[in-house]
């Protein structure tokens, strides 16, 4: 009797754990950064050699969107961000992430040339698809992405007035996500 019972209990436990895992949304990856200050960085902007730091956004609720011209999902979410930026007075800061990939011919060039190529590609892409960003910064080597725990692009963060990360979304932002989670959160943070 025990020989049949123990494997049967083990099997049912395994099925329960698998069912729980399959019902979770993979885009809702828990981030250890939620509730903690946004990692500091200082990167050059897409527009000029001026630099941007999250400290410049203290006192404002803002979105931080990690994107790349080579990212297919970024193309899907981009019209949503453009429409959101037109309707809302919320700053969106873009992080152009690893624009120069290792297999890219520009990867063998100097850092200055890589930056120039990345800026040109990003600027052309934003001209073609619209620019929802208050500013966009260049993360050529992906170090800032690592600090933010980026799993892949696109990723979007909501950061409050004190510079604390309040929300992280992995994957394309949809109108439904904006309406149901991001906008209510940002409005609530704006009142506090």
Q: Where are the regions that the model predicts?
A:
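Thiol-/selenol-based redox modules, centered on thioredoxin-like
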Residues: 158-192
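Hydrophobic beta-strand anchors of alpha/beta hydrolase catalytic cores
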Residues: 63-64, 92, 156
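Short, internal strand/loop/helix patches
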Residues: 111-158
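A short beta-strand-turn-helix
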Residues: 41-63
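Short pre-active-site segment immediately N-terminal to redox-active cysteine/selenocysteine motifs
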Residues: 60-62, 66-70, 99, 152
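N-terminal targeting signals for export/organelle localization
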Residues: 1-42, 191-192
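Conserved redox-active cysteine motifs that mediate thiol-disulfide chemistry
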Residues: 66-83, 97
